[in-house]
Design a protein with these regions (language model features):
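Hydrophobic side chains in beta-strands
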Residues: 91, 121-122, 135
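Non-heme Fe(II)-dependent double-stranded beta-helix
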Residues: 1-111, 147-148
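Generic structural motif
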Residues: 29, 94, 124-126, 138
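A generic membrane alpha-helix/interface feature
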Residues: 36, 99, 121-123, 150, ...
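Double-stranded beta-helix
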Residues: 128-170
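Active-site region of the double-stranded beta-helix
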Residues: 80, 106, 123-132, 140
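Short, conserved beta-strand element in jelly-roll/cupin
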Residues: 103, 110-128
Length: 170
């Protein structure tokens, strides 16, 4: 899929907001193929939810992570030296009571430097009804928030970490 991108604009957006969103990366057909691959793998080996390093045993997650468009976007954020650390499926089906609490990826994943990024790539429709990702533009400029462990059974995050002091109005 050939996607015209202004890499400089992506970089500026990342600097300003702390994230880049709404960039079409895959064709609908490619998304369907990757979703089917994930579901086929689950039929064979069980749930992939929060199985770390999925890219080391399945080709589909490695293909997603090394897609040229994905790499261009990541390069616009952190430069050309890119190392893939982990691919994890975080499965949250539409209309389920599950949710992802407010958190900062660097803290959640135990990363120490802000030259590391996480990429969320939806393999299903993600909108207000189905439960899309929410971000707080510019929150990365406020430093790291304290996180607390919670026992919220509907929190999709493995450790239940929730950032304290989040003001959604900012």
């Amino acid at each position: 899929m050939d996607i015209p991108m202004d890499i400089r604009a992506l970089s500026q957006t990342y600097e300003r907001d702390g994230y880049i969103g709404g960039v079409p990366i895959l064709s609908p057909e490619s998304v369907a193929q990757h979703r089917a691959s994930m579901e086929a793998a689950e039929e064979q080996i069980g749930s992939l939810h929060y199985k770390s390093k999925a890219h080391t045993i399945l080709t589909s997650p490695l293909q997603l992570a090394t897609d040229p468009t994905v790499l261009d976007i990541v390069e616009s954020m952190i430069g050309p030296d890119i190392l893939l650390y982990n691919v994890t499926y975080i499965i949250k089906e539409a209309n389920a009571p599950s949710h992802v609490s407010w958190h900062q990826d660097l803290t959640y994943w135990g990363l120490s430097h802000d030259d590391q990024v996480s990429m969320w790539l939806a393999l299903t429709v993600a909108d207000d009804v189905s439960g899309c990702m929410r971000m707080l533009p510019g929150s990365h400029k406020h430093g790291r928030y304290d996180h607390e462990m919670t026992e919220d059974e509907f929190n999709v995050l493995l450790q239940g970490q929730t950032a304290r002091g989040i003001d959604e109005d900012k």
